[in-house]
């Protein structure tokens, strides 16, 4: 009886620690989460501040900001959600592409 109790008291904490380790190892970094959302949510830029704890995301104006926020809520770690404030701005990707091409042309970078 004592051997079973001791075995149980050793086994349960070991299983709990293994589960916690498994969960922690499967968490994605904020960069991984944002890169995985790139195409689905029409992201065209993101920046993660080091000194200013903020994540700034640029996305296509035709995509849903609410769905992106829900995705981030579900996929960012608790620590990342507590650490960073999230800012999202929307813009027309066609306009951005045109501006980029004009910039390249003006600076002779489009060779």
Swiss-Prot record:
It comes from the Bacteria. Keywords: Signal. Residues 1-24 form the signal peptide. It comes from Bacillus subtilis (strain 168). This is Prophage-derived-like uncharacterized protein YozM. The keyword Signal applies.
